[in-house]
Amino acid sequence: MRYRVRGPEEIVELSRRSGEVSTIQSVQGTVEGVVRPDFFIVGAFKSGTTALYEYLRSHPQVFMPFLKEPHFFGDDLTRHYGRMSLSEYLALFRDAQPGQRVGEASTWYLYSTTVPGQIAEFSPQAQIIILLRNPVDVMYAQHSQLRFRADEDQADFASALEAEPARRRGERLPPPPARPETLFYRHSVQFADQIERYLRIFGRDRVHIALFDDLVTDTAATYRAVLDFLGVDPTFRPDFAVHNESKRVRSGAIQRLIYNPPGPVRGAARVLRRYPLVHRARDALLGLNSRAEGRQPMDARLRAELLDEFAPQIERLSTVIGRDLSAWRN
């Protein structure tokens, strides 16, 4: 499938191809009014990306669109409302001011095998930001989030893990299967492989990796390191409020309507969600239909089993990123 957008001096093509690198070819040059992102927060899911996105949005030298997680890139990703067009994607950044760094945050870019190559060809000098968390904790938080979004029909985390092999074969998927890959818990946290894809394409000097643990224990220092990486004023200090905390749904029916509207409504929702006012109204409705509630601890025996299972991967990830992750194995 091929997307094409024509501008006064630019033709941008996105060719959807199989393999690790899918091609975006562009005729380079200065095009008045066309702004493209130059940095990307690519994941990981449930690892502090929403907080970092909000903190960066408040920086006067940084522009990030109102719509978090546009997920424009990635031929191997599914989307609730379908893939936006290139013109819709570029429109997200049209309010950026001269001299601002321009970025976006789509947490499933880390999972995708095609996104790194697409970003590199779309924005050749792009910088990549990755937040990481203990994969066992990510899976557990992921399950809670999918339950909140009415995308997971297995209330028990262990049952959801047990269903993963069948789901990867297209079986036992909950109705409607909006984004099946989000249900592949173990497969989605193969962080060493995912990061190596980005390092091969962008090199270590253009990939900044931070830990969720650091963001929690020393938010200011972690944020300042990101600002240094982006080359913007590192002394700016936003309100370090908590974002995207664990919540419980009040009405499952309302939640399903918001996240998975019926077919006749889905087309309109796809268009309307691009407007900031509609987006704010949706967020307000989500807020009314939920209440903050601390996540119950994972079953101790299951957690111990998963930590043993993921110990080799954590050790390999430690080598890839050059950080001591021994605390994750406790």
Which functions belong to the PLM regions below?
Residues 2-330:
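Anion-recognition interface
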